[in-house]
Amino acid sequence: MPRRGLVAGPDLEYFQRRYFTPAEVAQHNRPEDLWVSYLGRVYDLTSLAQEYKGNLLLKPIVEVAGQDISHWFDPKTRDIRKHIDPLTGCLRYCTPRGRFVHVPPQLPCSDWANDFGKPWWQGSYYEVGRLSAKTRSIRIINTLTSQEHTLEVGVLESIWEILHRYLPYNSHAASYTWKYEGKNLNMDFTLEENGIRDEEEEFDYLSMDGTLHTPAILLYFNDDLTEL
């Protein structure tokens, strides 16, 4: 395990989170910053959008920037859904929004360049992580400064990943001991694995507002010799 000062853990400069929430994906909703999600994965199509900038075939993709487009795909084949084309009677990709990048034309066409290799939706070239199927809120309280922040996190994220989310609020967050109800958290475990239960279903069953009770993680500063 690498070390920073006296604190063991991953190098956060190169740390890659595994999960992204739908709200995070929704923030990337412009041609110059274009993400989509489908079939449980998140994809950064910004470079594709730049490559085909000004091309009408990009329009259907730009229209769904920041959204989940799982309904475009057959979950069994992970390919674009297909249908019998009423004009040709052939099996074609189903594109209700109109044909988009890398989808072949309806009829044979001599000016269609098909030398792009794999279509953008096949393979993992554009993949940046997984989509959090379920999220929850967690409060993080810095006991040194009494500052409190509430984060939306994926239920399968480790504490390290939650720490990475928290860095914009406290760039020295890895120099703190993270505790819940007086016990040190295992940074490699999820909230649930650390005993921080998700009680949303219980609140729903009781017809109570779950936002009135959000668990809190307390941060205690360590003098770990890392740069302030």
Curated annotation (Swiss-Prot):
Compartment(s)? Cytoplasm, Cytoskeleton, Cilium axoneme
Against InterPro entries, the record matches this protein to:
Cyt_B5-like_heme/steroid-bd, Cyt_B5-like_heme/steroid_sf, Cytochrome_b5_domain
What's the superkingdom here? Eukaryota
Q: Using the record's annotation, list all stretches that form the Cytochrome b5 heme-binding domain.
A: 17-83
Gene Ontology molecular functions: metal ion binding
**One GO location term (cellular component):** cytoskeleton
UniProt xrefs under SUPFAM superfamilies:
Cytochrome b5-like heme/steroid binding domain
- What Pfam families would the database entry show? Cyt-b5
Q: Which GO terms describe its biological process?
A: cilium movement; regulation of cilium beat frequency
Q: Which of UniProt's keywords are assigned here?
A: Cell projection, Cytoplasm, Cytoskeleton, Heme, Iron, Metal-binding
Annotated heme binding sites: Y52, H83
* Keyword Heme (UniProt): yes
Q: What does this protein do?
A: Radial spoke stalk protein that binds heme under oxidizing conditions. Required for the coordinated beating of multiple cilia maybe by functioning in a redox signaling pathway.
Similarity remark: Belongs to the cytochrome b5 family.
Task: List the protein's name.
Answer: Cytochrome b5 domain-containing protein 1
- Source lineage: Eukaryota, Metazoa, Chordata, Craniata, Vertebrata
